[in-house]
């Protein structure tokens, strides 16, 4: 990463497969050091993280912003690649602790600035229960949406179609990455969400692609063949000793939305032309022409019906997430009057002058 570069991701999200978290694999590499934040809702964790992020930017550091899928305007974490250190909100639902306290991380409890004895505990319990119910309903709609995914239509794709997609991927890999050298150490594969289904709808960070890549291969994914292509790209790049970013699909995380290879300035994205940032060189790989067109026409009515139903389920999921977020905002409002924000601000100013990440 270059100095001053800012990228954005999600480390966890609600998906059709349930709550899907990637934070443990991101926080645990032995060369990384994370300060784990603790504290309740409304205790200033996201504000603290934004101040840390801004301080890193002001110092000319590359900054990775890890957004909260429950409230995309908030942050779950900040990471400084050049310093191999960062901060992360280690509270539920993404509870985490340093693997080796003092060696791989430390704690920072912002809850110490909260007068817990003054809290309305009955109100807190009621709001938490209602919020959980809306999230459960959202999860049910997301599960239904995943089940209606047209890419999984029975009889749409045959084994020879998958093999044709893999052959195309191998050809592109040979051109972009060459062959693995003898004794080459495998590269590292980092998994991060480029997009998530949130209370504001689908949030996608195309500027992150632009920050890492000058060229993008846009892959058709109407028939689900992009996964075959991306799996080959990811494995080949890693065998060639290249570090890659593998981004799961926001609805079906067992699928892949994108594979980025920053050191080569190239990315591979399953999506539509609207997903490609302006100014990037684009090559369109038309994978949807591989399955037999007669077969596709025969299934078109079923696929269109499933797609319509899926969009309705997704809209309902977003509405449930919106209601959950409104209740979470009410929950934060219960905590705020009990917080000593003046003391927290003073502490933050002092802490930012001493933490090695900034």
Which role fits each region the language model picked out?
Residues 22-33, 50-54, 154-165, 182-183, ...:
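Short N-terminal helix-initiation segments at or just after the protein's N-terminus
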Residues 1-26, 163, 167-208:
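N-terminal pre-Walker A segment at the start of P-loop NTPase domains
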Residues 34-53, 200-237:
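Glycine-rich phosphate-binding P-loop
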Residues 37-38, 48, 64-68, 100, ...:
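A cross-family "folded-core" feature that marks the main globular domain of proteins
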Residues 2-19, 54-119, 123, 237-315:
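Conserved nucleotide-sensing/catalytic segment adjacent to the nucleotide-binding pocket
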Residues 2-59, 211:
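N-terminal accessory targeting/assembly segments
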Residues 123-176, 305, 309-351:
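An accessory alpha-helical subdomain
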Residues 4, 160, 356-358:
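Extracellular domains of the immunoglobulin superfamily
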């Amino acid at each position: 990463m270059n100095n001053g570069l800012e990228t954005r991701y999600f480390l966890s999200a609600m998906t059709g497969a349930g709550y899907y978290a990637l934070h443990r694999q991101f926080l645990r590499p032995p060369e990384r050091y994370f300060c784990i934040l603790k504290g309740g809702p409304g205790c200033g964790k996201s504000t603290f993280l934004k101040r840390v992020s801004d301080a890193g930017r002001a110092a000319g550091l590359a900054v990775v912003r890890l957004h909260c899928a429950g409230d995309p305007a908030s942050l779950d974490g900040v990471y400084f690649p050049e310093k191999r250190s960062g901060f992360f909100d280690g509270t539920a639902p993404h509870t985490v602790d340093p693997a080796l306290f003092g060696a791989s991380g430390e704690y920072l409890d912002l809850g110490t600035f909260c007068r817990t004895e003054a809290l309305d505990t009955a109100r807190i319990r009621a709001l938490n229960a209602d919020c959980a119910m809306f999230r459960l309903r959202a999860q049910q709609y997301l599960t239904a949406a995943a089940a209606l995914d047209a890419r999984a239509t029975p009889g749409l794709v045959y084994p020879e179609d998958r093999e044709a997609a893999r052959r195309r991927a191998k050809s592109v890999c040979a051109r972009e990455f060459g062959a693995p050298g003898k004794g080459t150490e495998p590269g590292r594969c980092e998994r991060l969400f480029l997009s998530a289904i949130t209370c504001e709808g689908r949030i996608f960070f195309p500027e992150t692609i632009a920050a890492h890549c000058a060229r993008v291969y846009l892959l058709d994914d109407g028939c689900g063949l992009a996964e075959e292509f991306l799996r080959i790209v990811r494995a080949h790049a890693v065998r060639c000793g290249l570090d890659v970013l593998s981004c799961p699909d926001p609805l079906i995380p067992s699928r892949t939305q994108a594979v980025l290879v920053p050191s080569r300035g190239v990315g591979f994205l399953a999506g539509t032309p609207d997903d490609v940032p302006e100014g990037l060189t684009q090559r369109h790989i038309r994978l949807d022409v591989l399955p037999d067109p007669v077969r596709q026409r025969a299934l078109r009515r079923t696929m269109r019906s499933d797609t319509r139903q899926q969009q309705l389920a997704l809209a309902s999921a977003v509405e449930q997430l919106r209601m959950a977020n409104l209740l979470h905002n009410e929950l934060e409002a219960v905590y705020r009057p009990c917080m000593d924000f003046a003391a927290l601000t003073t502490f933050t100013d002092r802490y930012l002058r001493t933490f090695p990440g900034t």
